[in-house]
Amino acid sequence: MALGFFCLAIFLYLSLDPDSGYTSASAAASGKEGVEITYGSAIKLMHEKTKFRLHSHDVPYGSGSGQQSVTGFPGVVDSNSYWIVKPVPGTTEKQGDAVKSGATIRLQHMKTRKWLHSHLHASPISGNLEVSCFGDDTNSDTGDHWKLIIEGSGKTWKQDQRVRLQHIDTSGYLHSHDKKYQRIAGGQQEVCGIREKKADNIWLAAEGVYLPLNESSK
């Protein structure tokens, strides 16, 4: 099992590092619609309205929690925009299983290993719910839990499918808008949580390495 995870880590590193010279078949094929998103896949989430990618880097907020900041990034080619889809602890889902509508999931930032997180701190620009990155491989709590809501009739999450992510603890939807930072993350836009359903909290899975679907999930 440990060897398998080590091999996966090497595969993801070679596939996703723009300086490595390698391109995975899964990443190259990810432009077609209908690819199943499975637990263990490393994906980019695109904000539907602005086309910015969900992004994080090792820069803390200067207000609120002071935790690692989360932003919307305008470019496509940036390894700080990859997130690994993980189940929550105590569930039966395993790597390669399909992600079902209504599932509670976690998103782990691939570069820093922290979890997409939210809480009641105010976001820096709009004063909505702050969204941050927090924890590590061995530290995670319910502040990292998000409910996947598929827009429409789909039962499992697929690439290019319109989805919302609702934070379990605060009920806020993962949200972004064209309000941009001027200093530390100049040109990047605010990501926050809001409790109202709006067009600005729709996301789509875009580029990534999509792990094959387990036979038991087909």
UniProtKB/Swiss-Prot annotation:
Keywords: Endoplasmic reticulum, Glycoprotein, Plant defense, Repeat, Signal. It is found in: Endoplasmic reticulum. Pfam families: MIR. It comes from the Eukaryota. Disruption phenotype: No visible phenotype under normal growth conditions, but mutant plants are insensitive to seedling growth inhibition in response to the pathogen-associated molecular pattern (PAMP) elf18 and show increased susceptibility to phytopathogenic bacteria. GO terms for biological process: defense response to bacterium; defense response to fungus; pattern recognition receptor signaling pathway. InterPro entries: MIR_dom_sf, MIR_motif. Induction: By tunicamycin. GO terms for cellular component: endoplasmic reticulum; vacuole. The keyword Nucleus does not apply. Gene3D superfamilies: 2.80.10.50. Glycans are attached at residue 214. Residues 34-88, 96-151, 154-208 form the MIR domain. Residues 1-21 form the signal peptide. The keyword Oxidoreductase does not apply. Interacts with ERDJ3B. PANTHER family: GH21273P, STROMAL CELL-DERIVED FACTOR 2-LIKE PROTEIN. Involved in the endoplasmic reticulum (ER) protein quality control and unfolded protein response. May be involved in the quality control of glycoproteins. Forms a complex in the ER with ERDJ3B and MED37A/BIP1 which is required for the proper accumulation and function of the surface-exposed leucine-rich repeat receptor kinases EFR involved in pathogen-associated molecular pattern (PAMP) triggered immunity. This is Stromal cell-derived factor 2-like protein.
